[in-house]
């Protein structure tokens, strides 16, 4: 993320918002880090109990958000801009910048396979367990993490376009456009297309009911996450492109205020998922309360019964468990490696 304070430290108007950014980012870190750690704990329990692919994706998302909060909010904004009030040496600073882009790309792109997972569950329910299962999900998550890191290496040469002596080059334009496409335009296009198909599919079924909280709740969480992401990240993308191609802004104080607000909104996305899960899912809310209660009382949580082989008819909302005997289909269970095993009903 761009520095908007450190390089103007000598100027009395270095930060137009005064102490608002340091207070905001401190609050965001103190709120978001424990919330995401608690989310990891709860989702780890749900993954062990239910062997659901969507829980694995949400778990990976929480882990990526923790990395974003550490590298961007703590190291970049708080440590470098407000505590040290100076930039790190060039090479370590650029390495940290690569890790920042890697973490933010992972946080965004891990939602894409989750969207595909929900699309298959809703639109192709009978194929869901042959396509999406824990072993494959873990491979997809690992691939996303590795790919996002490797594709973030070119951001070692990411320009600081907000300095007064910045000189635009063609390589900088390419990097900026790649950033805008990879973190916003392409993911939002995928979210919009697949979510539109899901909504269309749901509305076509007049007898649709959210039977079994799995698909209904997870799909609602997906819609909420993607909608909030598109809203909170839009100001940052607009600011970057406007500053790159728009008319020169004579008031740098106003520029830095606008960028500060845009960055604040974008990073808010990494700290609020826990509260969205609690609001939407009663199961998650109950487990969060039990975990916090056990934590404050220094007690072990009661052992939850679960089976290593998770039987499931379907994750589709179209099929009621009461009516599943009317449908000719296969029942799947998972082996110890998380791969589905076909068992005749």
Swiss-Prot record:
Which molecular function GO terms apply here? G protein-coupled receptor activity; identical protein binding; neuropeptide receptor activity
Primary location group: membrane
Task: Please state where this protein is localized.
Answer: Cell membrane
Q: Which residues lie on this side of the membrane: Cytoplasmic?
A: 43-57, 116-140, 195-220, 282-345
Is Protein biosynthesis included in the keywords of this UniProt record?
Answer: no
Q: Which UniProt keywords apply?
A: Cell membrane, G-protein coupled receptor, Glycoprotein, Membrane, Receptor, Transducer, Transmembrane, Transmembrane helix
**Topological domain spans for side Extracellular:** 1-21, 79-94, 162-173, 242-260
Could you list the residue ranges that cross the membrane? 22-42, 58-78, 95-115, 141-161, 174-194, 221-241, 261-281
Instruction: Describe its membrane topology.
Output: Multi-pass membrane protein
Q: Which residues form the signal peptide?
A: none
Glycosylation positions? 11
GO biological process, alphabetically ordered: G protein-coupled receptor signaling pathway; phospholipase C-activating G protein-coupled receptor signaling pathway
One cellular-component annotation, GO: plasma membrane
Please describe what this protein does: Orphan receptor. Seems to act through a G(q/11)-mediated pathway.
PANTHER family according to UniProt: G-PROTEIN COUPLED RECEPTOR 139-RELATED (PTHR46272:SF3), G_PROTEIN_RECEP_F1_2 DOMAIN-CONTAINING PROTEIN (PTHR46272)
Which family does the UniProt entry place this protein in?
A: Belongs to the G-protein coupled receptor 1 family.
Q: What is this protein called?
A: Probable G-protein coupled receptor 139
What lineage does UniProt assign to this protein's organism? Eukaryota, Metazoa, Chordata, Craniata, Vertebrata
